[in-house]
Amino acid sequence: DNLTKTPLRASHVIMIIMKRSKEVKIREVEEIAAVSCAVQNMYLTTTVYGIGAYWNTGGVTYMEPAKQAFNINEEDRLMGFFYLGKKKGTYLEGKRKPIEESVEWIDDYNTEL
């Protein structure tokens, strides 16, 4: 039931596909990371323009028939759907710790880990 109703909740849906590079041999994990960074940039852009956005990686994303239905090559990967539309309400204000609580700087390269 969610598979048929979820896409209707957004005015636009962008399919996120990682298309493997054939000319240059890049590790798959690096291509997945590159696509993820691109989606993050899309998300940041929608936030600036006040557009609601959501990246869904569930549902049909991991179903093999979906790759066939959308003509996705075997070596490529369906990485989800990016939903766009009018946002309901306002975004919650972020609560961040000072960076010093999350980062440890290493000044000496000879330091044993």
Language-model features and meaning:
Residues 11-15, 52, 80:
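Structural motif
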Residues 26, 30, 51-65:
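GST superfamily/GST-like fold recognition
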